[in-house]
Curated annotation (Swiss-Prot):
Keywords: Disulfide bond, Glycoprotein, Hydrolase, Metal-binding, Metalloprotease, Protease, Secreted, Toxin, Zinc. Monomer. GO terms for biological process: proteolysis. It is an enzyme of class 3 (hydrolase). It is found in: Secreted. It comes from the Eukaryota. Glycans are attached at residue 88. InterPro entries: MetalloPept_cat_dom_sf (IPR024079), Peptidase_M12A (IPR001506), Peptidase_Metallo (IPR006026). This is Astacin-like metalloprotease toxin 4.
Length: 114
């Protein structure tokens, strides 16, 4: 849909599921891609969460107090999704939320077999 707004979330069918975290510094359209397998309610909410400024719950600076990330089990090319954010570069809201829509599931991007 067309808009006269300068800053907006541009939701489109893409190759992957992604959105920038928060508003772009320079403004303008912010892409939110919903690729194959990305159109379930939870994934759409997750990507919208990124678009309004929420980081992954498992990337919190204090995440090691709540969970263990086995980086050797992460699919190649997705290691960045599990990096811990610096405390002075992000803000946490409340306690760690194991039920957060911003927390990847147990086997998300897992390269092994179950």
């Amino acid at each position: 849909r067309e808009t006269n707004e300068n800053d907006y979330v541009d939701i489109h069918k893409g190759d992957k599921c992604y959105s920038r975290v928060g508003k772009s510094f320079n403004g303008g359209p912010q892409p939110l891609s919903l690729g194959k397998g990305c159109t379930d309610f939870g994934t759409i909410l997750h990507e919208l969460g990124h678009s309004v400024g929420f980081n992954h719950e498992h990337s919190r600076s204090d995440r090691d107090e709540y969970l263990i990330v086995h980086k050797e089990n992460v699919l190649s090319g997705y290691e960045r999704d599990f990096e811990k954010l610096w405390e002075n570069k992000t803000r946490t809201i409340g306690d760690f939320d194991y039920d957060s829509i911003m927390l990847y599931g147990l086997l998300c991007l897992f390269k092994g077999s179950v």
